[in-house]
Swiss-Prot record:
Keywords: Ribonucleoprotein, Ribosomal protein, RNA-binding, rRNA-binding
CDD domains the record matches: Ribosomal_L20
Originating species: Idiomarina loihiensis (strain ATCC BAA-735 / DSM 15497 / L2-TR)
Example of a GO cellular component annotation carried by this entry: ribosome
Protein name, as recorded: Large ribosomal subunit protein bL20
InterPro entries in the cross-refs: Ribosomal_bL20, RIBOSOMAL_L20_CS, Ribosomal_protein_bL20_C
Amino acid sequence: MARVKRGVIARARHKKVLKQAKGYYGARSRVYRVAVQAVTKAGQYAYRDRRNKKRQFRQLWIVRINAAARQNGLSYSRFINGLKKASIEIDRKILADIAVHDQNGFAALVEKAKGAL
């Protein structure tokens, strides 16, 4: 059997991890052993927060829709119920965008929702 020396592979792996840790503070960006831990933890946070981002944006949209609906004299839950009864299928992302950028259009939606209740 031929002897296998892993210097090139180990160096490449170290370089890869240290490149991923670029910009981290102190030893986290310089020391391989610490950088591995930092990069692994960063990956866990990224994985978790890609899922949390969806929840947080939905919460934000609901807050914006609720605020705009209450300005027009209707609570969020009654507004959504009215839209469903009026068979208006607009998702919360678009409703929030309309609420922020087109108050008159949102007021018209609120009136349709009130009429359907």
